[in-house]
C-alpha cells in the first residue's frame, strides 16, 4: 500500500529531472501528500508539464461520484482483471513525481517511516488516471498509485510498496502500447537503490505539512518504538 508521499524537490531540479517546462498551477512543495488532495502527475497528454489530479481513482463509467473510501492504489498483479483499472492501464497511465513516501509499521504503536532514493533524488511512481464527467460542467481528473510486492528494505515494514519506475522507462510507460513490456516494469525497485528512516508521528495527520515531517528522528533504531 502507499497512502502518503512527499514532493519537496526544488522546482528547477524537478523540471530538469523530468524534462518539464512548468506546470498547470504554481508549484508548491508537498511534505504530506494524502488521498483526496490534488497532487502532481505527468501524463501523455502533457508530458512536459505537471498537472494536478485528485488522488483516488474515479473511473469514467462510474454513474455517480463515490462518497466512500477513495481507491488510492491498484495492485500490479490484477490490472488487466479489474474493470476499474483495465482500460486505464491500457490507455491512461501516468507518472507520479515524488521524493519520498511514508509507510507505517503494523505493530500496536504505528511508527512512520520515510523511504527515499539513496541519492535523495526525485523519482516517479507508476500510476493510472481517469476523467469523470457525469455531472454537467463537472470534470474530475483522478489517479491511483500502482503497488507491487515489497523489496527487502520494505518487507519488514509492509507487504506492499509503490511501483517505482526506472528513469529509462518513463517515456514508454506514458505512451507505450506493448502490454508485456509495460507489465515487466511493474516490479519492486532494487532495495540497494533506496534507504529508509524514522520520522515524526506528526505525519499521521493529513492536516500536517511542512519540512519538519521529513526530518529523521534522532533515534534511528529502525524497529524500536522508543
Where are these regions (language model features)?
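Short linear sequence motif anchored by a di-proline
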Residues: 1-226
